[in-house]
Each structure stands twice: as structure tokens, then as C-alpha cells.
């Protein structure tokens, strides 16, 4: 269910990337582009956290903002966290 929701939420981003973005001049100051970042963030972190990361990225992407390499942060799932003690 969760994966399907992520795919559904990423679909409009993919439509933008394939249909709208090619006819517009390049404008994103970051790599990966904001749309690629948003799609990866939603697929990696889920709809809520990934959407929040995408919104924060879009807010930073303006002429007076930063630029350069800005990857999606790694997932913070509990299974990625090592145990506190080695029993």
C-alpha cells in the first residue's frame, strides 16, 4: 500500500519531467534537478517526509539561493540504526 501511494504521488512529477520540462529552459540551480530530487525523496522517505523535503528544496531554488550538488538525505529507518548495546 505504501509503495503504491508513493508511485501515485510521483506520477505527476514524472509527467512534468517528460512533457513540460523539455520545452522549458533549464532553470534549476541544483543537481539533481528539483523534480528528480522530489521524486527520489518521496520514493526514499515516503509521501509526508519526502514531500516536506521536496518543498524545502523548492523553497531554496531561487536566484539568491544556493546551488550545486544537493542529494536526498539517506533514509533514517529504525533498521538502519545500530543497536545501543552489543549483548
Curated annotation (Swiss-Prot):
**Where does it reside?**
Cell inner membrane
Q: Which UniProt keywords apply?
A: Cell inner membrane, Cell membrane, Membrane
Annotated segments matching region Disordered: 64-87
Q: How does the record say this protein sits in the membrane?
A: Peripheral membrane protein
Instruction: Kindly indicate whether the keyword Transferase belongs to this entry.
Output: no
Family matches, as SMART domains: Haemolytic
Predominant location: membrane
Does Ribonucleoprotein count among this protein's keywords?
no
Specify the superkingdom: Bacteria
Q: InterPro entries annotated for this entry? A: Membr_insert_effic_factor_YidD
GO CC annotation, single:
plasma membrane
Q: Name the PANTHER family for this protein.
A: MEMBRANE PROTEIN INSERTION EFFICIENCY FACTOR-RELATED (PTHR33383:SF1)
Q: Which family does it belong to?
A: Belongs to the UPF0161 family.
Per the entry, what this protein does is:
Could be involved in insertion of integral membrane proteins into the membrane.
This one is known as: Putative membrane protein insertion efficiency factor
